[in-house]
Amino acid sequence: MDQLIQLVEATQSRTDFPVINPGDTVRIQLKVIEGEKERLQAYEGVVISDRGAGASKTITVRKISHGVGVERIIPVNSPNVESVTVLKHGKARRAKLFYLRKRTGKAALKVKERKFPVKA
């Protein structure tokens, strides 16, 4: 059974996805279908969490939009994810940055920048 799961995950997993850690600021291009039209929508924010592994891996991205915090859980292997760009590598001492939810203003997105990014 484990071999079957590994085989399916190997065929379904994306290889063009960059290394993303909590604290990184990312821009994700998502496919949005409105009626018959399909367009790309950019979603930019701080990665506050990553879960799972393989085909079921997800990341939680948080941004502040018009003074309101917005979080989105994005499946890494979703066909609706067109591309992911890492804008800044953040330095975080926690695996989950849920404490950013309590902060307001600029402090809500403030994470120290990592001088030397982690290599894959």
From Swiss-Prot:
Gene Ontology terms: biological process: translation
InterPro entries according to UniProt: Ribosomal_bL19, Ribosomal_bL19_CS, Ribosomal_bL19_sf, Translation_prot_SH3-like_sf
One GO term describing the cellular component: cytosolic large ribosomal subunit
GO MF: structural constituent of ribosome
A family per Pfam: Ribosomal_L19
Similarity comment text for this entry: Belongs to the bacterial ribosomal protein bL19 family.
Protein's job: This protein is located at the 30S-50S ribosomal subunit interface and may play a role in the structure and function of the aminoacyl-tRNA binding site.
PANTHER family: LARGE RIBOSOMAL SUBUNIT PROTEIN BL19M, RIBOSOMAL PROTEIN L19
Cited NCBIfam families: rplS_bact
Protein name in the entry: Large ribosomal subunit protein bL19
